[in-house]
Design a protein with these regions (language model features):
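Conserved HGGG/HGGXW glycine-rich cap/lid loop of the alpha/beta-hydrolase fold
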Residues: 18-69
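Active-site loop signature of alpha/beta-hydrolase-fold enzymes
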Residues: 39-40, 65, 130, 207, ...
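Conserved serine/cysteine hydrolase catalytic core
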Residues: 161-241, 247
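Post-His helix in hydrolase/transferase enzymes
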Residues: 248-252
């Protein structure tokens, strides 16, 4: 028997001088998947394919990622505007389930808090965490800067492919500092979301073999979720024995 395939359609969303490639396929309840920083539709292909078996899935690339065009701004608000443009311009028969991974989870919470009734619910994957302490601070800044400079260097080998990411190491660092600030007040955003919220979180966010700094980051990550659940005990939370790459490694 031949394998069953799902028909997909590709469109472009134009806004703010940026072209966002959008792919839609599957059948069922509408679902919009917002990727994270340094993550593309191509990276999330396995997850997208699985979701299409039960949902009408809309997937896209954020500015500077995949085949989306580059931009002059890579701020939190700029990425939020990409998500808003997709949700505004793609015609859906009913409010979608909004799934966000990493940075995409933070964008999803902000969008839902600003557009009551525009989404049916949120599924947040390892992001939008009201951590009690910022991640990029003090002695860790140098280590993060080196890590993201190395990532940007490796990303250059992907230019012209569906997995390319155009941000520099400094732009990645600056955005993560901004995300720390966003998460310091995100509890207020959660209080304005009156739709079902589910979370899928990594138990070892920083990964294995990263020493005391990694263990401290993991404790901070878990403490943030505990803080959220005290404020919103209705949020359903699942912990996976995985690191922050869980959307790529644990899609099945």
């Amino acid at each position: 028997m031949a394998a069953m395939t799902t028909r997909t359609n590709t469109i472009e969303v134009h806004h703010d001088g940026v072209t966002i490639p959008v792919t839609r396929g599957g059948r069922g309840r509408p679902l919009v998947l917002c990727p994270g920083l340094n993550t593309t539709q191509a990276d999330l292909h396995e997850l997208i394919t699985l979701l299409r078996s039960d949902h009408d899935v809309v997937a896209f690339d954020l500015r500077g990622h995949g085949f989306a065009s580059t931009a002059g701004r890579y701020t939190f608000d700029a990425f939020l505007s990409d998500l808003a443009a997709v949700l505004t311009q793609v015609e859906l028969p009913e409010p979608p389930v909004l799934v966000g991974y990493s940075l995409g989870a933070d964008l999803a919470v902000h969008y839902a808090s600003e557009h009551p009734g525009a989404v049916a619910g949120l599924v947040l994957v390892d992001g939008a965490n009201p951590v009690p302490e910022p991640f990029v601070t003090g002695a860790d800044v140098a280590a993060f800067r080196a890590m993201w400079e190395d990532l940007a260097t490796r990303n250059r080998a992907l230019r012209g492919t569906a997995r390319q990411v155009s941000l520099t190491g400094r732009q990645i660092l600056d955005l993560n500092v901004e995300v720390d600030a966003v998460r310091s007040t995100i509890l207020d955003r959660y209080r304005r979301v009156h739709r079902p919220v589910s979370m899928v979180m990594s138990a070892s966010m920083a990964g294995d073999g990263v020493g005391e700094r990694g263990r401290r980051l993991d404790r901070n990550w878990r403490a943030g979720v505990e803080r959220l659940l005290r404020a919103r005990p209705d949020i359903r939370t699942t912990w996976l024995d995985a690191d922050h790459g869980l959307a790529l490694t644990h899609a099945p």
